[in-house]
């Protein structure tokens, strides 16, 4: 972080992209400005956005590879220049772009002699390769080469325990971090009591999303983190009132969902996707990871099922019900339901 004094004045709060370029297929750069900010605010925003950009953005990568008739990852395969470990490292570097949730299967099946690149990966429709020229292996002899792959969308660095899998599959330490680097600098301008700060934010991504898309997603994630405090303020709750009180799961949530299902006669709930419910990105992502794509999928789950979803919180449950209550009777069902 760099702090400098510069001349100038900014009258209204605004943000904009002041520079954007594509250095390569796997390196995008963007530079953004936010101003005016009071003294100290630029640091607060800069630190929060940097952490969110580096740690909260989801990415898609290869998490497992299955070879046939390979005893261990340090083996060499006749007719292939690289060892199994080198092939795994090359697969780890493959950059993918997708909006998938859950685990998907992919594969490679080619005949040598030839170079194998990312272009040879057979992917599900929802996944695409950012750089098809990324190398995987070099077949030096006319052999058949097949690998089964597993693809997953996640966030951060996922380390898999090394085990001796009997079926020839090997875990890959996945790096689900589309943002490669973030830097911010603060410029102070003005005189005396009129001083304010300008925040410059630089973002480098791996090409699976643009810096602008990464900034948007990081901002949404930060907003979701603070929503519980906003709800607490709206409901007039205080820490003193709640610090010694335990709130058990409310059975009324499940009861209301049951009533809603009883009133769904003639309504094609399998045609109503959760994208239409205006859920927060956090709640939406939780449901998608649990393979809940439609309203029918959601209503088939019990409250206990929802609470078992990874990262799903009581606040998410309340938000889902509030959203159903707000939108379904009016916008989607077109008739008033009584609960």
Curated annotation (Swiss-Prot):
Chain positions covered by the region annotation Alpha C-terminal domain (alpha-CTD): 264-339
Name of the protein: DNA-directed RNA polymerase subunit alpha
Subcellular location: Plastid, Chloroplast
Pfam families: RNA_pol_A_bac, RNA_pol_A_CTD, RNA_pol_L
Recorded GO MF terms: DNA binding; DNA-directed RNA polymerase activity; protein dimerization activity
Residue ranges, annotated region (Alpha N-terminal domain (alpha-NTD)): 1-233
Swiss-Prot/TrEMBL GO biological process terms: DNA-templated transcription
Family note: Belongs to the RNA polymerase alpha chain family.
Classification of source organism: Eukaryota, Viridiplantae, Streptophyta, Embryophyta, Tracheophyta
Organism of this sequence: Festucopsis serpentini
GO cellular component, one term: chloroplast
Function noted in UniProt: DNA-dependent RNA polymerase catalyzes the transcription of DNA into RNA using the four ribonucleoside triphosphates as substrates.
SMART domains xrefs: RPOLD
Keywords, comma-separated and alphabetical: Chloroplast, DNA-directed RNA polymerase, Nucleotidyltransferase, Plastid, Transcription, Transferase
CDD domains named in the record: RNAP_alpha_NTD
């Amino acid at each position: 972080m760099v702090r400098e004094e510069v001349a100038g004045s900014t009258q209204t709060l605004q943000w904009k992209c002041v520079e954007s370029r594509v250095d390569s297929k796997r390196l995008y750069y963007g530079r953004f400005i936010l101003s005016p900010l009071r003294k100290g605010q630029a640091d607060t925003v800069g630190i929060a956005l940097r952490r969110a950009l580096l740690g909260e953005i989801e990415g898609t990568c290869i998490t497992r590879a299955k070879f046939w008739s390979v005893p261990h990852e340090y083996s060499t395969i006749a007719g292939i220049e690289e060892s199994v470990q080198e092939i795994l490292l090359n697969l780890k570097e493959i950059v993918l772009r997708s909006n998938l949730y859950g685990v998907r299967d992919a594969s490679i099946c080619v005949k040598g002699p030839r170079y194998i690149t990312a272009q040879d990966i057979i992917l599900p429709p929802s996944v695409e390769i950012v750089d098809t020229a990324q190398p995987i292996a070099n077949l030096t002899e006319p052999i058949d080469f097949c690998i089964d792959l597993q693809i997953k969308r996640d966030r951060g660095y996922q380390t898999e325990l090394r085990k001796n899998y009997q079926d020839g599959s090997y875990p890959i330490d996945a790096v689900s971090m589309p943002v490669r680097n973030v830097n911010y600098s603060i410029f102070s301008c003005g005189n005396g009591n009129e001083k304010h700060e300008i925040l410059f934010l630089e973002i480098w991504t791996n090409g699976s999303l643009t810096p602008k898309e990464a900034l948007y997603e990081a901002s949404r994630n930060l907003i979701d983190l603070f929503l519980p405090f906003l709800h607490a303020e709206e409901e007039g709750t205080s820490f003193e009132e709640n610090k010694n009180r335990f709130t058990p799961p409310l059975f009324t949530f499940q009861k209301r969902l049951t009533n809603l299902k009883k009133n769904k006669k003639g309504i094609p709930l399998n045609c109503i996707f959760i994208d239409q419910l205006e859920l927060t990105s956090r709640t939406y992502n939780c449901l998608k990871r649990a393979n809940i794509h439609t309203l029918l999928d959601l209503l088939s789950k019990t409250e206990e099922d929802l609470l078992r979803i990874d990262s799903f919180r009581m606040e998410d449950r309340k938000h889902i019900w509030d959203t159903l209550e707000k939108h379904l009777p009016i916008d989607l069902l077109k008739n008033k339901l009584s609960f």
